[in-house]
Design a protein with these regions (language model features):
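Conserved Class I SAM-dependent methyltransferase catalytic core
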Residues: 14, 21, 30-43, 185, ...
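Signature of N6-adenine DNA methyltransferases within the class I
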Residues: 1-10, 46, 261-271, 280-327
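Non-catalytic, mostly N-terminal accessory regions of nucleic-acid modification and defense proteins
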Residues: 1-192, 251-264
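Generic recognition of stable, solvent-exposed alpha-helical segments in well-folded globular domains
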Residues: 6, 10-17, 35, 39, ...
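A generic secondary-structure signal for well-formed alpha-helical elements
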Residues: 42-55, 164, 214, 218, ...
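Conserved S-adenosyl-L-methionine
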Residues: 171-275, 280-284, 289-293, 327
Length: 327
């Protein structure tokens, strides 16, 4: 078994260094999905294995009973998708296909993850030797630690997101808002309970910090409901994974969609709205939305969506609700 101390000493950098091995000639935008997918897969497998061993020790024969896991918010991992099985095939030519099959098997057993996990590890552009090396590195890292597993992986996931955003420069801001900015918004709004909404949620950082705020103030995370939306399918999936590893069940719509042209929460009136919308968005679709009911304070300019974002949020705000917006 891997040394659990690795989870608290340079853990984030250890994972990031492993990610860099995979990069090769790929752009950050391409390989971040591979890396974040592997982190997610290793984490849910580790968490499953811990519960599995606990059930084996109890001796009642329930270690393959899916209800034993889902009742505790643990994703069920089928035998062929467990990390121990993947690790044995790390240095075979089929390792990419093995991981893709594992992702499909996990989605099949866990409806919440359907169509969310990346399944592009078998593609020719991904160096299978390097992929096997990263699997080896992850095999020797324990992704969970009793009593704080969500925070450990959450911290790692957030660290990698920030590093990817830094590498991608301006484009990285589309899926990641610096944690210091997010914390400031959350501390001002104080979302203790009620409906929390982010109309351009990126990787879900606003929701994660809201949940942390509730937990840090001895509140109950079940007292907040999470609603969000993002137009980028890859980012939407990142948000789903980011929230899943923290035990947060959001409503991000059935699919990724443009907030202006396809509002996935048309009747929502949120108690807290926090967002970092794309600044000065020029081509946002006003020609199709001139008569939209959201424009109570005048039609926004066609060449700049800033006023449209503000009005969209006001439209979705409950009578006593509060907005925190980065603009």
């Amino acid at each position: 078994m891997a040394d659990r101390n690795t989870a608290t000493i340079g853990f984030e950098k250890q994972i990031w260094d492993a990610a860099c091995v995979l990069r090769g000639n790929m752009d950050a935008s391409e390989y971040k999905n591979v890396v974040l997918g592997l982190i997610f897969l290793k984490y849910i497998s580790d968490r499953f294995d811990d519960k599995y061993q606990e059930l084996v020790e109890e001796g009642d024969g329930f270690e393959e009973d899916i209800d034993e896991y889902t009742s505790e918010g643990i994703f069920f991992v089928p035998a062929n998708a467990r990390w121990s099985e993947i690790a044995t095939k790390a240095h075979t030519p089929e390792i990419g296909a093995v991981i893709d099959d594992a992702m499909r098997a996990i989605e099949k057993e866990n409806k919440r993850l359907k169509d969310i996990l990346p399944k592009n590890f078998a593609r020719p552009e991904l160096d299978k030797r390097r992929l096997g090396d990263v699997v080896d590195l992850f095999t020797n890292i324990q992704m969970i630690e009793h009593g704080s597993e969500k925070d450990i992986l959450g911290r790692t996931y957030e660290y990698c997101l920030s590093m990817f955003a830094e590498q991608e420069g301006k484009r990285g801001g589309e899926f990641f808002t610096p944690s210091c900015v997010v914390r400031t918004l959350v501390e001002v709004l104080k979302p203790f309970k009620g409906r929390v909404y982010d109309p351009c949620c990126g990787s879900g950082g606003m929701f994660v910090q809201s949940a942390k705020f509730v937990e840090n103030h001895s509140g109950n995370i079940s007292n907040i409901s999470i609603y969000g939306q993002d137009s980028n399918p890859t980012t939407w999936k990142m948000a789903q994974m980011n929230l899943a590893i923290r035990g947060i069940e959001p409503d991000l719509g059935a699919y990724a969609a443009d907030t202006f042209l396809d509002d996935r929460h048309p009747t929502l009136r949120a108690d807290y709205i926090m967002a970092n919308p794309p600044f000065n968005l020029s081509d946002w679709g006003l020609d199709k939305l001139k008569e939209d009911q959201r424009w109570k304070y005048g039609i926004p300019p066609a060449g700049n969506a800033n006023f449209a974002w503000l009005q969209h949020m006001i439209f979705h705000l409950a009578p006593a609700g509060r907005i925190g917006m980065v603009l």
